[in-house]
Design a protein with these regions (language model features):
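Single conserved hydrophobic/aromatic residue that forms the stacking wall/gate
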Residues: 1-6, 10
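Rossmann-like S-adenosyl-L-methionine
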Residues: 12-195
Length: 195
């Protein structure tokens, strides 16, 4: 193995090579993961170059995206996907929409202009902070965002407190939705579910 100092030198050389080879990269961040899995929520993020976030734009909206926040990797296709989701939601401006697994609130904020109110729920607290910032920088005042494990957040009590959704938009992680979440969605009886 390498010493910590040697490892540091190699890391800097690699990052500098990436930065020099791809000058179009405006922000370059890295994480050191010595675990046997690829989760990063419990790891520190280091900025090598640029800012600790990027911005994406669609339909005049700006979205701040941090390193621990989920965002579709293909921005152009993300935009097409969000337009289709919005169309499937059939919004008229009067609906209460729940955006489950909202990430940085991109879909929630994207559909907010066609809804009465949008509530976004996400597991990653940093992503929810980005979602709130995204609503603020876009002048959106009809979104609410909550951080926590979906099965603990989306309960019958939550729905009783915040209202029965007319539409649920859900983009769960690969593992899918916990059965408790599915049960609460069935309890909520939304007119439409966009999955």
């Amino acid at each position: 193995g390498y010493s910590s100092a040697a490892s540091d030198v190699y890391k800097r050389q690699l990052l500098q090579y990436v930065s020099d080879t791809f000058p179009e990269i405006t922000s370059l961040l890295y994480i050191i993961n010595n675990k046997r899995n690829d989760t990063i929520t419990d790891l520190d993020v280091y900025t090598f170059k640029g800012k600790d976030h990027i911005f994406e734009e669609m339909e005049g909206l700006r979205f701040k995206i941090g390193p621990k926040s989920f965002y579709q990797t293909n921005s152009e296709q993300a935009y097409n996907l969000y337009k289709i989701a919005r169309d499937f939601a059939g919004l008229t401006g009067n609906e209460l929409v729940y955006d489950l697994y909202t990430g940085t609130g991109t879909i929630a904020n994207f559909v907010s202009r066609q809804a009465r109110q949008v509530i976004g729920i996400e597991y990653v607290p940093e992503a929810i902070e980005d979602a709130k910032v995204n609503a603020e920088i876009n002048g959106i005042d009809n979104t609410l965002f909550f951080a926590g494990d979906m099965k603990d957040m989306l309960t019958q009590e939550f729905i009783n407190q915040h209202g029965r959704p007319d539409v649920i938009i859900t983009d769960p992680p690969r593992a899918g939705m916990h059965q408790d979440v599915v049960d609460v969605i069935l309890f909520a009886e939304p007119k439409r579910i966009v999955y």
